[in-house]
């Protein structure tokens, strides 16, 4: 965490503080964390459920503030656990979007068998079915009833809604489901950039702009995400789980959960060194937890005024 003297705070509430990232990957990137310094080694998924929910509601408020003040149409969320600093959420304004939703895809694929020291939403080459089934079985083995049949209830107004996620919920598409409850379904993506990359969706079509969901729908989705994160850690032996809200591959609310694994040696120093800092003035079709180049004090002050000046 940056020192208090150098933080450009844009929002504070209930023990949380949000401030401009001094090394933004995109303009106006914000870090949300506890107001007081916590112990190093933090993940939002290791918070108590009630505290986790308060963090996620805080992120929703910050996203609305950024949309209003920066004139962006939506924000993304990225949270990667850290072994050397407290838990954080990053709220990223997505610049350059059209008024109407259309798919945006990253220009390149990326796969990391072990934690590369960041989380990204980039896709990777398709896994074969047997490898996906092997991962699915590892995860489901930690369920109370691993062999229970899937619940194929679909809650959309149109019972034949044609979207991919709707068809997955109804069991009409090949899938590697790892968890479900009355309101949500979690399944492996066949294009994972990390083993066990999981997508969580509600049982009815909702906007892919998660921060604009009704409060009840938002709370339901983020609490289901917390539950699935616990399952993935236990089932796969991941040291942590990353989280991304983005919504530009499919226009249907979904959370992305990314298991992170240490190299076989278990030596943290073996983790891949992140690439050189990148800065994206407009949304490039993916988001990442990577830091960008250091922002100038003048730029941070200008951004701070734009967000906080009423």
Descriptions of predicted regions:
Residues 1-310:
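HIT superfamily nucleotide-processing domains
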């Amino acid at each position: 965490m940056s020192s208090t003297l150098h933080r450009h705070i844009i929002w504070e509430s209930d023990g949380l503080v949000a401030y401009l990232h001094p090394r933004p990957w995109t303009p106006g990137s914000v870090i949300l964390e506890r107001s007081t310094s916590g112990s190093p080694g933090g993940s939002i998924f290791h918070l108590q459920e009630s505290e986790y929910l308060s963090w996620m509601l805080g992120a929703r408020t910050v996203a609305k503030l950024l949309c209003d003040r920066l004139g962006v149409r939506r924000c993304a969320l990225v949270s990667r656990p850290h072994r050397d600093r407290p838990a954080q959420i990053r709220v990223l304004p997505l610049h350059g979007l059209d008024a109407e939703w259309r798919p945006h895809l990253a220009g390149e694929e990326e796969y990391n068998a072990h934690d590369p020291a960041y989380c990204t939403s980039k896709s990777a080459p398709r896994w074969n079915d047997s490898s996906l089934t092997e991962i699915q079985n590892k995860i489901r083995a930690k369920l109370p009833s691993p062999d229970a049949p899937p619940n194929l209830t679909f809650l959309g107004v149109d019972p034949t809604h044609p979207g991919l996620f709707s068809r997955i919920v109804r069991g009409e598409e090949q899938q590697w489901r790892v968890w479900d409850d009355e309101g949500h379904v979690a399944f492996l993506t066949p294009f994972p950039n990390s083993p066990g990359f999981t997508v969580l969706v509600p049982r009815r079509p909702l906007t892919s702009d998660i921060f604009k969901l009704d409060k009840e729908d938002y709370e339901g989705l983020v609490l289901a995400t917390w539950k699935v994160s616990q399952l993935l850690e236990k089932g796969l032996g991941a040291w942590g789980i990353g989280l991304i809200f983005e919504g530009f591959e499919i226009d249907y609310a979904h959370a992305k959960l990314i298991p992170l694994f240490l190299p076989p040696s278990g030596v943290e120093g073996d983790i891949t060194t992140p690439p050189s800092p990148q800065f994206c003035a407009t949304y490039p079709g993916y988001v990442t937890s990577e830091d960008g180049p250091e922002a100038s004090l003048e730029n941070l002050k200008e951004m701070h005024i734009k967000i906080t000046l009423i």
